[in-house]
Amino acid sequence: MADPVEDIIGDYRAFVAQQRDRLATRGIDITPYPLSHLAYRVPEWYQYVHVRGLLERHAIANPENVWNGRPMSLILLEQPLEVLGGAFVPLIELIPPVHQRVYKMGLEHLGVVVGDGVDEFSRVHRRSLTGQQFQNAHNEPYYVLFEDFTHVKFHRRSLREVVELQGARFDGFHHVEDWVPQRIVTATGPNPLPR
């Protein structure tokens, strides 16, 4: 059976399995935890708009908003993606061209919901973690950065819950209007990603 989301973002099952296996070699087992989201990055604005349109065909909501000076889509899928033999990913964070450093284009990170035990989790796994991001009062994930510039982020709350705490609603499709993209060179250069 065809998987239209896989056709758009690539083999997300293999990506999640790879991240799980990499974490296991570092002594971190993510199987007990729910999954928040997958992040997918594109190097050019026109690709962002195109991929957003394709993904929204398989979604029920996208409260797109501006974060760090550029639009960001939070695409709530009509059917969550099944991964790891029974875990589900309900949301795709679609991220336009980068704002500050080198990032992996395509499938870039997996969000894992550790819950209120996330600080204890960080103490237990301190040697395996790369750092912590301070995004806002509701979202300060710990993360592991791998050599290929992909990540796994460990959250107190799912990305959907964070966005709802900030006042957004997943009630249809809302896009940022009148935003003008900046020209930024990414780690993949000015050329599009290979297909």
Question: Which residues does each PLM region occupy?
Answer:
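Glyoxalase I/VOC metalloenzyme domain signal
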Residues: 1-36, 40-69, 75-195
